[in-house]
Amino acid sequence: GVCGLDNSGNSCYLNAVLQCLCSTVPLVEYLLNQDTQAELAQSKCRLGGVFVQLLKKMWMGGYSSCAPVEARSVLGSILPQFNNYSQQDAQELLLFLLNVLHDDLKKMRSSTLQQRRKQGDKRSIAAAAWETTAVSQLFEGQMSFMTLCMHCDHQAHSSQTFTVLSLPIPTDTSKCTIEDCLSLFFQQTILTGGEQMLCSVCGLRRETTVFTCLDNPPEILTLHLKRFGCKGKNQVKLRTNVLFNMKLNISPFLSSPEQNSSYSLYAVVNHTGNLNMGHYTALCQSTITGTWHHFDDSAVKEVQEDFVQSSSAYMLLYSRRLFQKP
């Protein structure tokens, strides 16, 4: 699982994200399962099939580096945004990859269901019909929102699924912690003026307090630091040093405190430079040896744990359970 990826022209954003997915052992084990491979091939899932072939090279090919040419080509054919040699945003790519992979796995499941119907396997059909994909099982979580009318105290509840939490960074400091960013994301907000919400009891727009919390945290918690923003008419990058630990406890942000709230860091996407001339790299922990590796396209080097913390961190991937050796 330690294999560099060649840069085929501003593809560092793709390489960094692929390295993180390649280090997500439960996903890799599922995709490299022989049954999954056969079903993906049979249902003609383009991205899923190409991604599996790349994972096989990276995990079992014995290569020091390889070129994800097919993966990039398929990506570009599905979404034209990635069909060029321009630098792209790694977080947008990760969301897109997970969505397409999720759709491919649903398509694969649908194809399998049709086969089972022909074979009359009703019990398997019933079980598979309710089955979510490996992507949603690992990466999806659920947030809940409670809105409180400041006039009549009426409460309304809603929920939303997510795969990545995009966290604001405090702007009044040069250094903060990842917990500060999470607190900023989950802090209660008061909607006033033009942002007032329509109260179903009052029948009027009223000042509203919004409370947000995590109802169902995901197995893989992906945190995106919102480093890119606007200052007036200019796009800027926030270079705040966001401090983070190898362990993260999210209990202050959970709706139910008895849930498992402890996570372990296993991958980081770094961004150096600015918006126009930037470069992405990845840091990933090996499940087999426990050591960390720095992936700079095709260049790979082993690093100490203290190297992982840096002001370049752009995305952090945490796992709720320790990965088992594959």
Each predicted region: which residue ranges?
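USP/UBP deubiquitinase core
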Residues: G1-K118, S159, S166-I169, D180, ...
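Residue-level signal for mature regions of secreted extracellular proteins and peptides
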Residues: L5, Q142-F145, T192-E195
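Glycine-centered flexibility sites
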Residues: G1-G4, G9, G141, G203, ...
